[in-house]
């Protein structure tokens, strides 16, 4: 596997910004003051989930690994204990980065060449089958911050192949009436559901849009678009290539933002308390999540 080439040009990084061994990246922008401001945004008592439901598929044969060949994001083996059963248990096999799973990417997920954030050699971060730097350990305390929702195509969807720029984000921000500030989570809607069945070119974030997020000091990104699925494999994945290894910005892939869009329209506001509390699993490259927007 080779890492796709980054576009030419001066791309800023956060390497060294919070120390040579930092593992939190842009989550460092979430200060106590940011959390307090976020909690103050929860005034109506409404809770909206940003996760797609996943139905497990019974495991009945060899396990195909990778994002594409797996029959589902979750495979399940049920265990009936006794007859009559005193308890029913199961084992779940999670294909974390499956396109059908709402999940968060750890910073180690995509390296820049032979380094991961913030300049740690890949051979040091991942060795002997274990991830020791840049893993999901950074999410053990959860993510609590203010979220801002930007709808790039209210009531519609972006055109196929649209390349999202900072100007698109500026215009969506003006419509929302809520400014993205340091430490905020950015949630974006383009009106698409990425899947392996899609034959059209999915809209995608450009480098300009990612640099917009860096300039605003976004702590975490969640959107129904991000990178266009690379065809052929090895093609550019600008958002993942810049956000994860260079900026140290965690990405939430595959969220369901439809109910959030409807709620923002109903309440006439686009900011909320944003909470993500993944399992406290260390040493993984990502985890399934159920992000919550609390109004």
Show the residue positions of the predicted features.
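Active-/binding-site microenvironments in catalytic and ligand-binding cores
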Residues: 1-295
